[in-house]
Amino acid sequence: MLMLLSPSKTLDYETPATTDSFSIPEFLEKSSELVKVLKQKSFLDLMELMQVSQKIAELNVERFNQWKLPFSTENAKQAVLAFKGDVYTGLDASALSENRLTYTQSHLRILSGLYGLLRPLDLMQPYRLEMGLKLKTKKSENLYQFWGEKITDKLNVLLAKQDNPVLINLSSNEYFKSVQKKNLDGRLITPEFKELKNGKYKMISFFAKKARGLMVRFAIDHNIQKAEVLQNFDYDGYHFNLELSQVDKWVFSRG
């Protein structure tokens, strides 16, 4: 079983890492190609490309200009500890023991516009580059074209090592478009999280994001190896809703 998350825009490079263990991203050569393009952009270019404020654009001009190889614990941080959005609030990786971080390294991957596919302990330098951006390079019109088959091929290598290859998609639509799901060599399961509001079950983005992280944490806490066991997920009042679920679309609801 392999779980897949989106990254977050919010980053934390102030809090010291809670582990000395780390790995190096596998697509750094491709990341370097993107950074080379991004270093040529002004803050005005980034404001238009990313649709962000001048302050955020200037911050990312600085980030891309400071981005350099090789990565070390002096100039980079483990991805699962650096990301700090709603998903990662639910995951709360800084509270994980070394053994549990080892589990994440085998069972979790994080999609990234800049790094392609990250292991949780992969070192990364700070950036902002959403997968849906139309960043042009010499050979591609956008990041989906840039990454092409690479992310899917890597996921297939990982799935091939499993007895029952299953990918649990806990990423957003924007990021999962970078995966060519028709070419996946395994079963694809997409959990959804819904709240009961005015007599109807609805997906509310803030709660759903946190729940994705909570599901990963549930898998870590219970050392889950088989996807079906995730149907026991019960953190924060959620439960598996058989009535709303389909074969490969599992709905968890509360309220």
Can you name each region flagged by the protein language model?
Residues 4-95:
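Active-site helix-to-loop segments that bind/position phosphate- or nucleotide-bearing substrates
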Residues 93-246, 251-255:
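Internal, well-folded beta-alpha domain core
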